[in-house]
Amino acid sequence: MLIIPAIDIKGGKCVRLTRGDFEQEKIYLDEPSDMAIIWRKQNAKLIHVVDLDAALTGKPENFDKIKQIVDTLDIPIEIGGGIRTAEDAARYLDIGVYRVVIGSAAVKNPSLVSQLIEKYGPRKIVVGIDAEDGIAKISGWTESSQKKDYELALEMKDRGVERIIYTDITRDGTLEGVGYETTKAFAEKAQMRITASGGVFGKQDLSKLCKLEHLGVDSVIIGKALYEERFPCQKLWHLFEESISLDTNFSTAEQKQNSVAG
């Protein structure tokens, strides 16, 4: 089970929302790239980044902040939020983003998904399904798609998608525990690779999700539980480290440049 830390960006800052409510935000750091370095130092293998502003406007509002994260780290970054055209996807992939997450556009313009899969392949293009009571929601969770979550997944599967990021909106940002039953029901019907998201409280939730690995649930995105240090290992890190330095260079681009120069 791969643990994927989440970084949500709103107004250029690293924030967390509760159930996707833009009026219930908590700012954790002014610089998202600083948060990315912290997660990298805590052994993250992949980081999930969302441009919350773009999810509403459809424009890459925090592109520069995302590029800064990509330039800083030496691990893959996936980005979601407001990616609604082929140009949007290309712009992110061109700066080194590992893969992009298509959300609202999968409902409003499903042919875009086929186009992107054909050009970049299924490793670079995944679909995010954010569900409330089994119905997929779009446009920053402000609109209903009128489609059942698993039906949308099967449609995307027919278009070549291999992975779904499945978020239980009713749990997201609440620390009330992962939506085990909803995730299980979705996984049973979708029969795809699935990254679970929403509501993770602690290690007991990870143990539950591990029981779904045979259904394709092989990874989980964790936000607030990591920010609020709900895992014992995080407390140990702080006990043995006087401070977390943010000056270490993780830049893949600079490492390559130094290698060539040497």
From Swiss-Prot:
GO annotation, biological process: L-histidine biosynthetic process; L-tryptophan biosynthetic process
Keywords: Amino-acid biosynthesis, Cytoplasm, Histidine biosynthesis, Isomerase
Pathway annotation: Amino-acid biosynthesis; L-histidine biosynthesis; L-histidine from 5-phospho-alpha-D-ribose 1-diphosphate: step 4/9
Active site: D8 (proton acceptor), D130 (proton donor)
Main location per the UniProt record: cytoplasm
Pfam families named among the record's database cross-references: His_biosynth
Catalytic activity, EC: 5.3.1.16
Gene Ontology cellular component annotations, sorted alphabetically: cytoplasm
Molecular-function GO terms, alphabetical: 1-(5-phosphoribosyl)-5-[(5-phosphoribosylamino)methylideneamino]imidazole-4-carboxamide isomerase activity
Record localization: Cytoplasm
Catalytic activity: 1-(5-phospho-beta-D-ribosyl)-5-[(5-phospho-beta-D-ribosylamino)methylideneamino]imidazole-4-carboxamide = 5-[(5-phospho-1-deoxy-D-ribulos-1-ylimino)methylamino]-1-(5-phospho-beta-D-ribosyl)imidazole-4-carboxamide
InterPro entries, alphabetized: Aldolase_TIM, His_biosynth, HisA_bact_arch, Isoase_HisA-like, Isoase_HisA-like_bact, RibuloseP-bd_barrel
NCBIfam families: 1-(5-phosphoribosyl)-5-[(5-phosphoribosylamino)methylideneamino]imidazole-4-carboxamide isomerase (TIGR00007)
Family to which this protein belongs: Belongs to the HisA/HisF family.
Protein name: 1-(5-phosphoribosyl)-5-[(5-phosphoribosylamino)methylideneamino] imidazole-4-carboxamide isomerase
Species the sequence originates in: Chloroherpeton thalassium (strain ATCC 35110 / GB-78)
